[in-house]
């Protein structure tokens, strides 16, 4: 057996790899496909267009198909000087040799305690065969021949690097021959007693040690027959000798017992329940074989093992069909019972030979996570499985098939064809040199340096790999179905990391949600929300906080907590006074510009982009810049006295979208007064603005009075005189903007706001660019006036007074004003170009 790197310590490798003995034992036998080497994108050699669910076959200890051809050169250089280093075995060599020589130590102890001298080396010549029958002679000769062959094997393998494995193979072969010899006499009690006593008295030390090894091996296979054969010898040897012999024969030795005991398989994810389906009716009188006990102990490391026992009556009328139906019903009932007790535990059904076939049929009836078929019987009396009417083709449970390369009931080629027809996800593991029960022959063991225990452990590693993938996928699907969220949909959604995107996509106030609903749905009608504190007051708090914070940061002063509370109290008091002074039916609109001298530290790139946008106005809304330069607060007046306040507020601090300002419809004189107020307060700072808000209450009321006195008849909104909300104002303003666009079809619209039926009348001054340094606070007024003066009022607002200057400073408003002045054919439209 060739392994690259002879000086590699396989014990260290085994400890590093943990439970993956498969990597160390079978990786050197994995055949490299030349197609994969040259074309990595190609499919496996066994891939089929219909086999979408069949995974590539895994090979364990399978001899490569392409053997190296013998060289035709007669002259070959043979290196006779270099000493090839001895490869280290995969097991603990020291511990393996210790358990290997255990029977020799017991023989030396037993013969030393005995009174008589040990028998000589030519012990066979000193045996008195007088009076032996023909059956006795034949039985003795067969057993002696097997023991002599085992003795020759010991001498031949003495000092070999893998002597424990070779010794184990020789002992198993000798035990098989002795068992055949005892079976030829039907395990007759008299003959077996006579043979055992004769061998104990006559055999030499080396031959007696070999005989004890054979008894130790047969005790694990046929314990009841060996116990009956040793019953007579216990009387002669005494209690101490019988007890020592029973302890010796209790456990057969194995070279890899140390590695397997220290490196056990790890638990599977989800803590599954492993049900072992029986291969036939079970009888409590016959204990489970040692190999099956080893498999159960190894599978118990993966999860909870539940063996299923099937008891069939001993009546003569029970046929094979009835027995199979009873077994399938028992297995199905056990699966249902386990499901009822553990509804959230994954269930894995494992079966050997016929048990694997029953497991597949039960998976068609009941839900389970996976099925493991060990030694699947593919051949039947009517031919191989996989016909059109075969119910196994409709399997949906993931299944793993483990078959032997030399199996008579299932060849790897036929298994490949069968797997291609199965709908369920399936995998195949082929064990080289194994039969239907996955037992490899002695020739394969000797050439590979393996034991059956090592092969079983490699098969278990393959099972662990398959079940880990299945359970991981089932857990992910289970979490996805159990929760309301959709992980795939969340992955497809764009992730917004910028704060202004979050503010823009998710409004934080009821007013913003109402406005967004109006803009998105033409037929939506926002409902007033009953809250303890009106949204206008909340927005006023937010606005005051940000204004004070910005002013303090720019002025370099430190605002204490008490000062902030005092500022809040003053602002709230002023706000309440303003709201009380305004009549319920006539809310007002006030523009308070903050001078652009206070907005410092702006990037030059933003200014260049702003200039370019002013030179080439685009009908589409401009993109948001990274830093906001405009803060607009829209505060709508509440409902009439005694009604639930439906006022809304919106503060745009970080959004770069086009902002709409609701302007009450006024006459020309009202627009002039408003522009005078704007120009009068343009020179003041932020502190002056707050002072002006408190000191100019009379001017505010005079402005309001002039606006109300010049207004015409009120708007009829659904037959009531309620004050319009922010959403209704937007609906009316959208209609006004549409009228502007219809009267001047050549003018591209700067914003589009969809609304339902008009509940209020007003205009929208849109596309406020963030590049401007003006901070505006807008308090909406009721839009009163007839529909005949909508367009003229907006034109006058845009062409006269300080509002036109404000529009010139903003690219969006400048675009609207230029278009409106163009329709009136005034020569000043050419002079008012954006600077």
From Swiss-Prot:
Name the GO cellular-component terms.
histone acetyltransferase complex; mitochondrion; NSL complex; nucleus
Compositional bias (Low complexity): 817-828
Q: What is its subcellular localisation?
A: Nucleus; Mitochondrion; Cytoplasm, Cytoskeleton, Spindle pole
Q: Which Pfam families match?
A: Abhydrolase_11, KANSL3_1st
Q: Which Gene3D superfamilies match?
A: alpha/beta hydrolase
Oligomeric state and interaction partners are given as: Component of the NSL complex.
Name the record gives this protein: KAT8 regulatory NSL complex subunit 3
Which species is the source of this protein?
Answer: Danio rerio
């Amino acid at each position: 057996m060739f392994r690259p790197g002879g000086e590699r310590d396989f014990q260290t490798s085994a400890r590093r790899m943990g439970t993956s003995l498969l990597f160390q034992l079978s990786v050197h036998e994995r055949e490299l496909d030349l197609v994969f080497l040259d074309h990595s994108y190609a499919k496996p050699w066994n891939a089929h267009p219909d086999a979408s669910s069949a995974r590539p076959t895994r090979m364990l200890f399978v001899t490569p198909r392409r053997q190296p051809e013998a060289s035709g050169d007669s002259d070959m250089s043979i290196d006779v000087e270099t000493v090839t280093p001895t490869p280290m075995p995969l097991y603990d060599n020291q511990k393996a040799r210790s358990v290997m020589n255990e029977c020799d130590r017991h023989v030396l102890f037993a013969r030393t305690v005995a009174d008589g001298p040990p028998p000589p080396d030519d012990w066979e010549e000193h045996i008195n065969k007088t009076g032996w029958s023909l059956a006795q002679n034949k039985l003795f000769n067969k057993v002696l021949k097997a023991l002599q062959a085992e003795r020759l094997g010991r001498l031949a393998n003495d000092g070999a690097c893998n002597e424990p494995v070779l010794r184990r193979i020789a002992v198993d072969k000798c035990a098989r021959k002795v068992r055949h010899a005892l079976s030829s006499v039907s395990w007759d009690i008299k003959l077996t007693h006579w043979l055992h006593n004769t061998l104990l008295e006559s055999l030499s030390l080396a031959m007696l040690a070999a005989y004890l090894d054979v008894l130790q091996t047969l005790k694990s296979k046929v314990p009841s027959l060996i116990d009956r054969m040793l019953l007579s010898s216990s009387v002669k040897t005494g209690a101490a000798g019988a007890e020592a012999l029973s302890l010796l024969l209790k456990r057969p030795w194995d070279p890899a017992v140390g590695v397997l005991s220290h490196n056990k398989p790890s638990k599977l994810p989800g803590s599954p329940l492993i049900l072992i389906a029986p291969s036939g009716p079970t009888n409590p009188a016959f204990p489970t074989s040692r190999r099956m006990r080893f498999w159960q102990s190894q599978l118990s490391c993966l999860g909870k093992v539940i063996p299923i026992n099937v008891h069939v009556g001993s009546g003569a009328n029970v046929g094979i069909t009835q027995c199979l139906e009873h077994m399938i019903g028992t297995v199905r009932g056990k699966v249902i019972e386990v499901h009822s007790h553990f509804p959230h535990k994954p269930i894995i059904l494992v079966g050997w030979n016929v048990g694997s076939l029953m497991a597949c049929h039960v998976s068609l009836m009941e839900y389970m996570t996976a099925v493991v078929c060990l030694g699947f019987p593919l051949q039947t009396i009517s031919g191989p499985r996989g016909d059109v009417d075969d119910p196994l083709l409709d399997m949906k449970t993931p299944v793993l098939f483990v078959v032997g390369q030399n199996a008579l009931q299932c060849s790897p080629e036929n298994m490949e064809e069968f797997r291609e027809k199965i709908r369920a996800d399936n995998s195949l593991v082929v064990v080289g040199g194994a039969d239907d029960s996955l037992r490899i022959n002695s020739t394969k063991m000797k050439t590979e340096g393996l034991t059956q225990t090592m092969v079983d452990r490699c098969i278990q590693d393959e099972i662990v790999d398959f079940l880990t993938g299945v359970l991981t996928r089932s857990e992910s699907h289970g979490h996805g179905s159990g929760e309301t969220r959709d992980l795939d949909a969340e992955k497809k959604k764009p992730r917004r990391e910028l704060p202004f995107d979050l503010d823009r996509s998710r409004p934080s106030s009821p007013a913003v949600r109402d406005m967004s609903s109006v803009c998105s749905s033409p037929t939506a009608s926002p409902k007033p929300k009953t809250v303890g504190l009106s949204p206008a007051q909340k927005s006023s708090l937010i606005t005051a906080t940000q204004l004070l914070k910005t002013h303090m940061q720019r002025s370099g002063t430190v605002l204490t907590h008490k000062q902030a509370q005092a500022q809040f109290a003053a602002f709230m008091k002023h706000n309440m006074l303003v709201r009380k002074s305004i009549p319920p039916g006539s809310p007002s609109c006030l523009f308070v510009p903050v001078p652009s001298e206070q907005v410092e530290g702006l990037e030059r790139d933003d200014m260049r982009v702003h200039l370019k946008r002013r030179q080439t106005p685009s009908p589409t809304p401009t993109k948001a810049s990274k830093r906001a330069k405009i803060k607009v607060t829209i505060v709508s007046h509440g409902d009439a006295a005694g009604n639930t306040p439906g006022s809304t507020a919106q503060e745009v601090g970080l959004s770069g979208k086009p902002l709409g300002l609701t302007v009450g419809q006024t006459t020309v004189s009202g627009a002039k007064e408003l522009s005078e107020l704007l120009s009068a307060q343009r020179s003041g700072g932020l502190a002056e603005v707050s002072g002006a808000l408190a000191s100019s209450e009379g001017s505010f009321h005079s402005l309001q009075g002039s606006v109300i006195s010049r207004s015409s008849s009120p708007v009829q909104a659904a037959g009531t005189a309620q004050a319009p909300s922010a959403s209704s104002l937007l609906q009316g303003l959208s209609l006004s903007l549409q009228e502007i666009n219809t009267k001047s079809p050549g003018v591209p619209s700067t914003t589009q706001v969809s609304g339902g039926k008009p509940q209020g009348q007003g205009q929208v001054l849109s596309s406020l660019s963030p590049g401007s340094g003006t901070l505006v606070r807008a308090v909406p007024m009721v839009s009163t006036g007839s529909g005949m003066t909508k367009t003229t009022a907006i034109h006058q607002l845009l062409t006269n007074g300080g509002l036109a200057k404000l529009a010139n400073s903003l690219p969006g408003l400048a675009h609207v004003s230029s278009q409106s002045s163009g329709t009136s054919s005034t020569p000043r439209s050419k002079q008012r170009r954006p600077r």
